[in-house]
Amino acid sequence: AVYEAVNSGLLVITGGPGTGKTMIQRVILDIYRSKHPDAKIVCCAPTGRAARRMEQSTGMPATTIHKALGLLAGDDGSYCEAEMLEADLVLVDEVSMMDVYLAGHLFRSIPRGCQLVLIGDADQLPSVGPGAVLSEIIACGEVPVVRLDKIFRQSYGSRIAANAKLIRHGNLSLEYGEDFQFFESADLAVSANLIEELYLQETARFGVDNVALLSPYRQKTETGIN
């Protein structure tokens, strides 16, 4: 992925959580800066939060795509024409969050000779706006794509990673074991007691700071977040 990014005019790098996308960004930037110390590099992402995370993880200044392109919203909600980027390398993270309009502005603003690297997870939900940009770029077959499929965030043989992949492909024949368990209960009160018991058990084992308790319900119910 790093070799292709440094030596290609356009590249897509896609992979799920924990496959090394962030590490690859850092390595791409380190190698590119060592080869081209005077190069102008633009790091950007569709949202402010994603841009801040990109800046923290790479150590390079990062901004939103809108700000990088000088896109200002008018009173009617439309945007002015984007500015042409002054860059030798443009690195875009979280591309799956980019809609077709923002992608159009970005691609028209890439100067001739500039290298463009698009990074994201094609299996994430598409953008709120129209167009599944990342998935459609990959599907067109005209753009070089590097797929990261080895997961480093979980241990080798993790059922969490294996089951996430099965679910993404609509397969519910999941694998169960110590690191992936399922408890079925039709009674909310029984479920709440079971959750409390499991939480106390796991916090005693791993410590409070290392155990997360999540609920799909915001409402104040037996299994809500209250």
Where in the sequence are the language-model features?
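N-terminal pre-P-loop "Q-motif" helix
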Residues: 1-7
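Conserved helicase motor core of P-loop NTPases
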Residues: 4, 123-226
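Pre-Walker A (Motif I) flank of P-loop NTPase domains
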Residues: 7-13
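Walker B catalytic acidic pair
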Residues: 93-94, 120
